[in-house]
Amino acid sequence: MAVINFDVKNISLFADGKSFGEHGQFNQIDGVVEFAVDPNNEVNKSIVDLKLAPTDENGLVHFKSKVSLITPSDTSKGNARLMVDIVNRGRPLIHGNFNRMDLFDSIEGDGFLFNHGYSVISLGWQWDVIEDDVLYGFEAPFAKIDETGFRGETVIEIRTNHVQKTHLLANRIHTPNTPMDINDPNARLTVRDWEDGPESNVPRSEWSFANETDSGVEPSDEYVYMESGFQPGKIYYLSYTPSIAPVVGTGMLAVRDIASFFKSDSNVNPINKPFEKVYGFGISQTGRMQRHILYLGLNLDESGKVAYDGHIVHVAGARKGEFNHRYAQPSQQSAPGFGHMFPFADEEMKDPYSDNVDGLFNELRKINAVPKVFYTNSSAEYWRGDNANMHIHPIEERDLPEAPEARIYLFSGTQHGAGTLAPDDVGPDGSVGMYKFNVVDYRPLLRASLINLDKWATDGTLPPPSSYPRINDGTAIKPEVLIEKVNNILDINTPDPKKVWLIRRVDMGERASEGIGRLPAKEFETYQNFVSNIDEDANETGGIRMPDLTCLLYTSPSPRDQRGS
């Protein structure tokens, strides 16, 4: 058993002791879970640098997660199901997406999950999250890297909403990825005007590893400085060799092993009663992490037991992410790299640009441990350039076969996050949209997905068939064709068709297969993209259409342009 301790920090009545129907009151158990894994066990072999991490006297590698478990006070009153909330950049998001907590200003919201008897555990897994009262942290082991030869590189993506001269060496406000040498002449800074645009180098003399302080500009291993300033609307990539090498992939082992722990008898389990089914929920970043976990086949624990019975992979698109390579930054998603690599679809196929034959479920099929999976996406993941590749051939105009264990759903006419009233044009990162944001609230569909997933995993009741843009029925269309159609219907500003994002084949060097990359990645041929077609009102026709689209009051545009970009 990989979980060796559950250090309970606090137990309290959840929601001030509110009772949730037949399931009664719930407890909230806050604590820290300690894991210890065998780096030589076959089920852990895919974790990059795990064998370079420190071990105890038994040869095991240790790491810890901050957790919070919400479960019925009387364990006999629950539904014997556990939802694992794979927190997004340290933040629990499951309650906002299933309990609609924003409408009630409380974590329990309208109580959907708890009224159905679900237990929920929120789990920290990301090495660079700075833990506090809100954020869930993770203590990862650090690998001892041979300082001779090529160690690998990382890349910091810099996008600003205003001119700034300094930027933290992290993706968002995380623990800085400090460089091994702040005077490294091989460190590189590049700039481009849009994601798929041409790239140019910024001369090394124009920037430095430094910070602007009250005493002036001073050398720093936590910041990058450029006198002319990083400009809004531009995309910068800074690559260098870091001084620290966290074993980032242990976060995925924590996600796997917390599930198997709660399905097994254990004397360190704070509720001392196994769950019958465990389902994972990830959104955006953590949805990509779920896809990466599936790809690596991480659904059997060290004793050979199945961890997850099902997953809801929400707004992840067709990518994976920076979750299992040396110097990875899990919050990074848009810079070309390991997360943009083939395969994109569940079933095995050949990469049209290489000899690689692979599928997301290949490793899981080898060990007979494929869980039930719901992929739920908004229109944004299609316009991002990658989502269609999970079900449409990447260079041929034909639909791909679906995996029998999965369902794929587009929530038509929606943006990345569920819409709310009243509409706004300022995003959580401070970016300003050209128009008010989409208000379609797709969360009822997430609730239905959970109910259907549970029935499927429990008694084999088949869920509704997949619903997404297809070539064979004309609901899938190239973005540039769609933009022209919109221009003929609506008098609005639309994206430049030449600047719509596409995923490209990437190359991180000769050791990329070991999880050790040269960055920024070299980019080559593009994989094509499709989006949903539209009707005469410019509303999407592919996927599941909410009443906002079928009982028409307005057009719900899916792409979101940012001012100044």
Where are the model-predicted features located?
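Long, C-terminal catalytic modules of enzymes
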Residues: 387-388, 400, 409, 414, ...
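Catalytic-loop region of hydrolases
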Residues: 1-240, 245, 298, 440
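Primarily recognizes the serine-hydrolase "nucleophile elbow" in alpha/beta-hydrolase
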Residues: 276-322
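Gly/Ser-rich "nucleophile elbow"/oxyanion-hole loop immediately N-terminal to the catalytic nucleophile
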Residues: 246, 260-279, 284
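Extended catalytic-interface subdomain
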Residues: 320-420, 446-451, 455-456
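Conserved small/polar residues in nucleotide/adenosyl-binding loops
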Residues: 554-561
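Short, solvent-exposed loop/turn and secondary-structure capping segments
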Residues: 44-47, 93-99, 131-138, 267-268, ...
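Phosphate/oxyanion-binding active-site loops and adjacent basic polyanion-contact surfaces
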Residues: 59-63, 240-260, 289, 342-354, ...
